[in-house]
């Protein structure tokens, strides 16, 4: 699963997830992309589940790019522990997603196959998504 090799600090504050994605909002590497239309947090497990769904559907053809990375640690206290005594330990990692962010990209497959593969990946995502194509100038 995806997570940073090392970080400056083990734990982070919650912070807000506002605004639109001004970076990473265009299809850069592939021909087709899966773009988020709502905001949320995607865990490393969900990113991997989406990647597997896409790669199983396209079989051997095509190339996949994952355009997001889970770099935010989420902490949790154990069950039945009283409040206080410090912040809990890191349980999992998430990527914060703003509307407009491209999650996955694909190339080397037909558009219909790409649409079906992204539909399967979208079913595993906690955010609403849409299919986008590369803009040719």
Curated annotation (Swiss-Prot):
Keywords: Ribonucleoprotein, Ribosomal protein, RNA-binding, rRNA-binding, tRNA-binding. The keyword Ribosomal protein applies. It comes from the Bacteria. GO terms for molecular function: rRNA binding; structural constituent of ribosome; tRNA binding. Pfam families: Ribosomal_L16. NCBIfam families: rplP_bact. This is Large ribosomal subunit protein uL16. It comes from Francisella tularensis subsp. holarctica (strain LVS).
């Amino acid at each position: 699963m995806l997570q940073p090799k090392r970080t400056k600090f083990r734990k982070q504050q919650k912070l807000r997830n506002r605004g639109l994605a001004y970076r990473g909002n265009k299809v850069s590497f592939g021909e087709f992309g899966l773009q988020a239309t709502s905001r949320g947090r995607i865990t490393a497990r969900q990113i991997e589940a989406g990647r597997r769904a896409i790669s199983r559907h396209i079989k051997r053809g095509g190339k996949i790019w994952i355009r997001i990375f889970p770099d935010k640690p989420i902490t949790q206290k154990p069950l039945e522990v009283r409040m206080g005594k410090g912040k809990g330990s890191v349980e999992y990692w998430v990527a914060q997603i703003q509307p407009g962010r491209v999650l996955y990209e694909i190339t080397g497959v037909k558009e219909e196959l790409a649409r079906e593969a992204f539909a399967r990946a979208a079913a595993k995502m906690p955010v609403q998504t849409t299919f986008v194509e590369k803009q040719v100038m």
